[in-house]
Amino acid sequence: TEDGRYHTIYNSNDGYPEWQKVDYYDDETDNYLQINNQIVVSHRFNDRWALNATGFYTYGYGFYKQYKDDADLCEYLNLPAGPTADVSADLIREKIMRNHLGGLNASAAYSVRKLDLAFGGSWSYYTCPHWGTLDWVSGMEKEQIGGRWYDNDVDKHDANLFARANWSVAKGLRLFADLQYRYVSYQAWGVNDNYVSEEVGMQPINVDKQYHFFNPRAGLSYTLADRNEFYFSFAVAQ
């Protein structure tokens, strides 16, 4: 303190050498925008049939800027092999992402006497490109900096179908069954922000996977004298 006033290491000159003084890049902030949209439809046709459906779409966009001191330029610029690849400089980098998620959920229900049926499905699609740019490099003009230093994208499709039944066989005895099929497709490509070596450059991404799942479930329940309930089920989950 000095005259009752406190100072931080960032603005105090009380014996700190220049190399210990710290400053921060003012624009290093996390920024993210998300917009959610939904359309919901619910309709009962009669005492037996009902329908529910929901369509949705979500948009997202985010970025942050970061100051890097004495960064290796080979991790950001396409430099020729040799001594020039070891050049370093101060720079400001920006990482950006944009995502889209859309889909539909729908189901129908049917009830008659002692039987309840439900069936439906859903589908969704998700994509989310990521990329990075350089806003500024010390000692270089803007046109010398080039384009994106990493760039990748991902696509995901997710769909499922289901059917469900509940049947009151007798007083206190109910049987139920539930069947679900799910399909997932996932692709990713491009390069991420991890530098591997001078020969490889940024780490490559190459994923192409498809998955199929079938999840059956069945069982019964029995209520005795309105006080005791016995329950048995069998299921397979994937």
Regions found by a protein language model. Give the residues of each.
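Flexible loop and strand-edge segments within Gram-negative outer membrane beta-barrel domains
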Residues: 1-35, 62-67, 93-98
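Short, contiguous strand/loop micro-motifs
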Residues: 24-26, 92, 148-149, 204-205
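Face-selective signature of the C-terminal outer-membrane beta-barrel domain
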Residues: 31-196, 221-225, 229-233
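Outer-membrane beta-barrel domain signature, especially the mid-to-C-terminal portions
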Residues: 190, 200-209
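Acidic glycine-/aspartate-rich tracts in secreted/extracellular proteins
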Residues: 237-238
